[in-house]
Amino acid sequence: NLLQFENMIRNVAGRSGIWWYSD
């Protein structure tokens, strides 16, 4: 599921403080 994948990426990026992923 693409939405779940996006949420996972956002979650990981948020915890590591690295915002390499955005809409």
Curated annotation (Swiss-Prot):
Cofactor note: Binds 1 Ca(2+) ion.
Highest taxon listed in the record's lineage: Eukaryota
Tissue distribution: Expressed by the venom gland.
A biological process from GO: lipid catabolic process
GO CC terms in record: extracellular region
EC number: 3.1.1.4
Enzyme class: hydrolase
Cofactors (names): Ca(2+)
Keywords: Calcium, Disulfide bond, Hydrolase, Lipid degradation, Lipid metabolism, Metal-binding, Secreted, Toxin
Modification(s) after translation: Contains 7 disulfide bonds.
Record's catalysed reaction(s): a 1,2-diacyl-sn-glycero-3-phosphocholine + H2O = a 1-acyl-sn-glycero-3-phosphocholine + a fatty acid + H(+)
GO molecular function annotations of the record: metal ion binding; phospholipase A2 activity; toxin activity
Its job: Exhibits moderate hydrolytic activities and prefers the anionic micelles (dPPC with deoxycholate) to the zwitterionic micelles (dPPC with Triton X-100). PLA2 catalyzes the calcium-dependent hydrolysis of the 2-acyl groups in 3-sn-phosphoglycerides.
Protein name (Swiss-Prot/TrEMBL): Acidic phospholipase A2 Ts-A2
Species this chain originates from: Trimeresurus stejnegeri
Lineage: Eukaryota, Metazoa, Chordata, Craniata, Vertebrata
